[in-house]
Amino acid sequence: MGVRNCLYGNNMSGQRDIPPEIGEQPEQPPLEAPGAAAPGAGPSPAEEMETEPPHNEPIPVENDGEACGPPEVSRPNFQVLNPAFREAGAHGSYSPPPEEAMPFEAEQPSLGGFWPTLEQPGFPSGVHAGLEAFGPALMEPGAFSGARPGLGGYSPPPEEAMPFEFDQPAQRGCSQLLLQVPDLAPGGPGAAGVPGAPPEEPQALRPAKAGSRGGYSPPPEETMPFELDGEGFGDDSPPPGLSRVIAQVDGSSQFAAVAASSAVRLTPAANAPPLWVPGAIGSPSQEAVRPPSNFTGSSPWMEISGPPFEIGSAPAGVDDTPVNMDSPPIALDGPPIKVSGAPDKRERAERPPVEEEAAEMEGAADAAEGGKVPSPGYGSPAAGAASADTAARAAPAAPADPDSGATPEDPDSGTAPADPDSGAFAADPDSGAAPAAPADPDSGAAPDAPADPDSGAAPDAPADPDAGAAPEAPAAPAAAETRAAHVAPAAPDAGAPTAPAASATRAAQVRRAASAAPASGARRKIHLRPPSPEIQAADPPTPRPTRASAWRGKSESSRGRRVYYDEGVASSDDDSSGDESDDGTSGCLRWFQHRRNRRRRKPQRNLLRNFLVQAFGGCFGRSESPQPKASRSLKVKKVPLAEKRRQMRKEALEKRAQKRAEKKRSKLIDKQLQDEKMGYMCTHRLLLLGAGESGKSTIVKQMRILHVNGFNGEGGEEDPQAARSNSDGEKATKVQDIKNNLKEAIETIVAAMSNLVPPVELANPENQFRVDYILSVMNVPDFDFPPEFYEHAKALWEDEGVRACYERSNEYQLIDCAQYFLDKIDVIKQADYVPSDQDLLRCRVLTSGIFETKFQVDKVNFHMFDVGGQRDERRKWIQCFNDVTAIIFVVASSSYNMVIREDNQTNRLQEALNLFKSIWNNRWLRTISVILFLNKQDLLAEKVLAGKSKIEDYFPEFARYTTPEDATPEPGEDPRVTRAKYFIRDEFLRISTASGDGRHYCYPHFTCAVDTENIRRVFNDCRDIIQRMHLRQYELL
C-alpha cells in the first residue's frame, strides 16, 4: 500500500538527479533542523490531521518577525526527510491549478503532526529552524491576512472550493490558538507523540484514539482514495496489512520506529501533495506547507497486526537514494477519486512501483502507443480487473500480465497477490484487481454488465462520472489531439492495464471531461482528482475570491455544462478542467481554453452552404439542406401564410364594413342628437311655482284645455279612438275626485260650526242627526257614497247656520271649490255623471311631486312643469331649475285672509311673498325672468265686495295705498277691487325692484285660473315675453 515508499522516500523512476529545465522553479533551501537524524519518513497529512495535540505548552507563531503568540519554547530539533517538499517546490509559492483542485472541502478534524523537509545547506538552523520544521503545517491560510474558516481549518482557493462546505466558526486576525508542545525529553508527556501538533478543531468529530499519541500515515501521493460514507478510516493508520508505526524520540534526538497494532483508519488523502499556505513562519515567500483538505472517515475501528518496521533501513527492492524533486513526477492514468453515497470496500491502495517496474511500464506504454494500442482506461472493458482507486498508484497491479515484466512471485513487482505489503490481492474479492467483479456499478466497463448505468462502456449512454474514459463520450477531435490521451478501451484480452503514455494530468482531464456527462438515471458523484505538477508549474496561483461567489458560479456553470451534454453538442474540452475549475480559475489557461473553444465552434456554421441552400434551395432540392426540418417547416408555413393573408384580407374587409356601418350609425345618432338639441333649444320650458292651493294645477289644466284638445285625450295622440279612451278613463277618475271634494266640503263646514269662536248653530235643529251622520262618515276610507249621503248633504247645505259657517271659511281651511260642488249635488249624485271641463278645472287634487305637460302654440313647443307648492314639496323644485326659459309664479290673491295648512297661523299671502323673494334672489335663478300670475281674481272681488274681511286688517299698508295712475281696470270692475288687486301686485314688484340687477324682470298678470278665456288671453300676452326671454337666454337678443 505504499508504506515503504512513504517511509524510505519516493524513488519513482525518472525523478532522481534530473537537472532543472528552463522555466522551472529553482531549488529552494529546505527547512532543516540541527542535529543528525536518520533518514526516515515524516508524518503524512493524515498524521497532521489526526494527531491529537499535546496541551502542555504553546508554540508561538510569527509573521515577519512579529510574534503572534507566547515566546518560543526550545525543544529538540529533528532532521527529517520528505520528498513532498521538493515536489511542491520547497518554499516556492504554490496553489494547485484548476485541473488538480479538489471539488470540495471538508471540515478538518485536526491538524496535528508536521511535514518535514529535506535537509539542504544554507538554510538557517537553530531553534527557529526547529520550529520551522514543524510550524508550517500549523499555519492557517488566513492566519495573518484575513478571516479563516475555523481554528486549524483549511480554506482552499476557489479552484478547490466545492459547492458546499461545513460550518466553521470564523476567526480573524492573528488570533490563532496557542499550540501546546509536549516535553520532548525522554519519558516526558509527549515522548510518544509527534511534537508540534496543533490542537484539534472544536468541530472535529472522531472517536478517541487507541494507543499513544502520534502515528504515521503515508504522504498524499501514496495514499489511496476514499469514500465519504465511511470508507476512509482517517487517523494515523498505515494501510491494511501493516502495523502502525509510532515515532518515538530518544535522548539523542533520533527517531525510533516502533510498530504497534491498534485500531486505525485509512488515510483520507489521495495523491495530493502538501500545499504552500501564505503566512508561514520564517518562510521567505510567506508560505507554509499545508496538507490538502480531506474528510475524516467515520468507519469502525480496524485492528491490523504485522511485523514492526524499523525506520532507517530500506527494504529489499526499494532504493532510498535522494532524488531531484524539481522534475515533475510521472503521474498515473488512474481514475479520478470519487465520492459516493455508500462505502466501497473493494478499493485498496497499492504501493508505488520501484525503479525497475516503472521502466518496464514506460516501455510497455511506448510499445502500446507505437502499436496504436490504447491504454486501458478506467472505463475500459479491461479495467474491470483494476481497482477504481488507481489514481494514487504509479502503476496498477497486474496479476497475470506476462508483458509487464513483473512476475507474480516477485514480492517487489507489485503484482504478488499474496504479498501483504503490496496491497494488491488478486484473490481478494474486494480488491480492485479482482477480475471476478465485472458487474460492479462503479467499475469501468464490465463485459458481462452492459446495462450497468454507471458503466463507461454503455454504447448509447454518456460517460459515467466514475468512468475514466467512455468510448461513446462526446468529445471533439481536437480535444483528443490536445490532451494526447488515449481514451479508447483496450483489447478484451488485455489481462492487466499498463502505464499510460500521456501524462496523468492530460488523462485525468479527459476522464473528467467524459465524466461531466452522467449516464441517464445515474447519480452524479463528486470526484477528487490527483494533482499535476506540470500544470502547477505552468499555472501560477491566482488570488482567491470570495467563497460564496465561487460556489455560486460553480453551481451555475455545472448546470450549464449539463445542458450542453444533454443536447449532445458539447466538447470534452469544455469540461477538461473539471467541475470547479471553470469558476475557480481566472488565469490565462481558462481564457485560452475559452478562446480556443470559440474558434473551434465557428467552422461548424457553414455560412456559404446556408446561403446557397437559401438562395437556390429549389434547384438543389430540400434533401441537400443542412436543416431539412427547417426547410420543410418553411414549406409547410407557406400554406398557412397564404391562408393567413386571405383571412387577414377578409378580416380587413369585415372590419372596413363594420367601421362603415358604425360610422353610419354614428352619423344617425349625431343627427338625432342635433335634432333633439334643436328641438330642445326651440322648446320653451316653463316652471310653475307658488304656494299651496294657489291654482298652479288649474293653470296646467287650462293649457291642456286650450292647446291639447282639452280632456278628450292625454295629448299628442294621433288616434282619436285612443284619445277618447284616455279621455273616458281620466274623466272616470275625476268623477271620484269630484265626489271626494263634495264630501270634504260638507264635512269641513259641519266640523267648523262647533270649532269656531263663537260657534255657529244650526238654523234647523232637526238637522242635527244629519250633522251626526256626516261626522260619523268623515274618516271612513273608500266611502261608496250612498244616496242618503247626498240627501243629508243637500239638506245641511240649505240650512242657514251652515251657510253662515261657510261665510267664515277664512277662519279654517276650506277648499275653493266647496260652493261650486255643493251647488251641484243633484248632478253629481247621478250614476251617469260625466264631469265637464269646468268641473275638472274646479276639482282640487293635492299635487305631490312634479307633473309635466307638453303642448304647442303656433308651432312653438312649450314644456310646463308643475311642482307641489307645499313646504315639504319645495325641495323638489331644484330638479327643474336648470335651464328653464321662464318661471310662472302663481299667487292666490284671494288668500289674504287665509292661513296655510302647515301651521294654521301664517297668512297665505304673506307665505307667497316670502316664497317669491327667495326665488327672485336665488343664485341659480338670477338670470331667469318671472311671470307673475295673480290668480283667483274672481274670489278676491267677492271678498272685497262682501266687506267682511278687510285687507287692511291683515296688511296695514293697504290703508295708505292708493291706486296707481297706470292702473287699467277691467270693464265694469269696482274700484275697490282694482285698488285691492294692484296693492297685491305692487307688494311683489317691490321685492323684484328692490333687488333687481337688470338681468331678469318680473311680468305681472291678473288671472282667473278657472276662466279659460282669461288664461288664453294672458298666455298669449306671455308668449311674446317668453320668446324674448328665450332669445336672451341663447344670447340672440
UniProtKB/Swiss-Prot annotation:
G proteins are composed of 3 units; alpha, beta and gamma. The alpha chain contains the guanine nucleotide binding site. Interacts through its N-terminal region with ALEX which is produced from the same locus in a different open reading frame. This interaction may inhibit its adenylyl cyclase-stimulating activity. Interacts with MAGED2. Its main location: membrane. Residues 572-583 have a biased composition (Acidic residues). Its EC number is 3.6.5.-. Residues 685-698 are annotated as: G1 motif. The modification ADP-ribosylarginine is found at residue 844. Residues 641-667, 730-756 form a coiled coil. Belongs to the G-alpha family. G(s) subfamily. Residues 343-354, 553-565, 640-660 have a biased composition (Basic and acidic residues). It is found in: Cell membrane; Apical cell membrane. It holds the Pfam family G-alpha. This protein is produced by a bicistronic gene which also produces the ALEX protein from an overlapping reading frame. Keywords: ADP-ribosylation, Cell membrane, Coiled coil, Cushing syndrome, Disease variant, GTP-binding, Hydrolase, Magnesium, Membrane, Metal-binding, Nucleotide-binding, Phosphoprotein, Transducer. Gene3D superfamilies: GI Alpha 1, domain 2-like (1.10.400.10), P-loop containing nucleotide triphosphate hydrolases (3.40.50.300). Residues 1007-1012 are annotated as: G5 motif. Residues 839-847 are annotated as: G2 motif. This is Guanine nucleotide-binding protein G(s) subunit alpha isoforms XLas. CDD domains: G-alpha (cd00066), UDM1_RNF168_RNF169-like (cd22249). Residues 1-105, 185-224, 283-588, 640-666, 711-734 are annotated as: Disordered. It is linked to GNAS hyperfunction: This condition is characterized by increased trauma-related bleeding tendency, prolonged bleeding time, brachydactyly and intellectual disability. Both the XLas isoforms and the ALEX protein are mutated which strongly reduces the interaction between them and this may allow unimpeded activation of the XLas isoforms. ACTH-independent macronodular adrenal hyperplasia 1: A rare adrenal defect characterized by multiple, bilateral, non-pigmented, benign, adrenocortical nodules. It results in excessive production of cortisol leading to ACTH-independent Cushing syndrome. Clinical manifestations of Cushing syndrome include facial and truncal obesity, abdominal striae, muscular weakness, osteoporosis, arterial hypertension, diabetes. Mg(2+) binds at residues 697, 847. It comes from Homo sapiens (Human). Residues 862-871 are annotated as: G3 motif.
